[in-house]
């Protein structure tokens, strides 16, 4: 785990301001608490504007893009998922289904409490000499738990995702495990022991779209991530996502996005809109 200010992060990064137009994809969690100015950041191809007191939570596998990091001050917290205790990970919703919206906007009564928790974590991280290493490490675990659970509490107020029908929650997790293996709703229904009608009804209630549309959206998102971040040809991405051919993948992608895979990739290598 690492905790630092955005200014420190910029100082440590030799090629700052980086290639701002280049999307990044990490295999760890990144929390950003904006403390001054306004930060603009893109996560999974959606732009977010963060005023002071707001948080951004970027999760492993998500593609993100800096836009104006020099115009804001922020506290950054980076951690691997295995640094979090299993109980906290479960309560905070780590690693379950599609990542929730990354923007968190605490109300005036919650914002200072969250900020204080983050500041305590930052202080402990920077003062490792004050305690024996086992105590220091234990404190980092506990203080990170506080931040994550408070943020998860905000998410639950705003989204109430876990109150969705159980068939949808199981389908959501099955899609995360298997979207590159099968694109057939019948296969998920058989695996989970539901009818396709039950899955579609539950997904409509929870997500506002059919089970097939939900699966297609997840495939499109992963395709966008691979196209934006990497350099693999469309044929390789097609195979990774379980399509029988690059042609089939190209038609699927264009039907859902209005662009060919290569046109989409090219659009992500230029400066995104503010």
Where are these regions (language model features)?
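Ligand-binding loop in jelly-roll beta-barrel domains
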Residues: 61-84, 89
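Amphipathic alpha-helical segments enriched in hydrophobic/aromatic residues interleaved with Lys/Arg
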Residues: 94-155, 173
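A short, Lys/Arg-enriched amphipathic alpha-helix from helix-turn-helix/homeodomain DNA-binding modules
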Residues: 140-141, 160-187, 191-192, 214-232, ...
């Amino acid at each position: 785990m690492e905790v630092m200010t955005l200014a420190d992060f910029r100082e440590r990064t030799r090629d700052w301001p980086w290639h701002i137009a280049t999307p990044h994809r990490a295999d760890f969690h990144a929390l950003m608490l904006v403390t001054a100015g306004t930060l603009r950041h893109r996560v999974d191809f959606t732009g977010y504007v963060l005023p002071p007191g707001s948080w951004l939570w970027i999760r492993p596998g998500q593609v993100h893009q800096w836009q104006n990091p020099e115009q804001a001050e922020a506290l950054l917290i980076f951690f691997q998922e295995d640094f979090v205790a299993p109980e906290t990970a479960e309560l905070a919703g780590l690693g379950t289904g599609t990542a929730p919206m990354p923007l968190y906007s605490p109300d005036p009564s919650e914002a200072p409490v969250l900020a204080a928790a983050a500041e305590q974590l930052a202080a402990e991280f920077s003062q490792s000499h004050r305690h024996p290493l086992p105590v220091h490490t234990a404190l980092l675990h506990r203080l990170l738990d506080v931040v994550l659970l408070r943020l998860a509490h905000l998410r639950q107020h705003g989204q109430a995702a876990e109150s969705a029908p159980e068939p949808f929650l199981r389908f959501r997790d099955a899609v995360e495990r298997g979207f590159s293996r099968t694109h057939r709703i019948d296969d998920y229904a058989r695996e989970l022991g539901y009818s396709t009608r039950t899955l579609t009804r539950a997904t409509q209630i929870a997500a506002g779209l059919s089970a097939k549309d939900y699966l297609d959206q997840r495939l499109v998102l992963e395709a966008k991530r691979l196209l934006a971040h990497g350099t693999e040809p469309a044929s390789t991405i097609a195979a990774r996502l379980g399509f029988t051919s690059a042609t089939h993948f190209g038609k699927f992608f264009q039907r859902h996005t209005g662009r060919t895979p290569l046109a989409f990739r090219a659009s992500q290598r230029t400066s995104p809109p503010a």
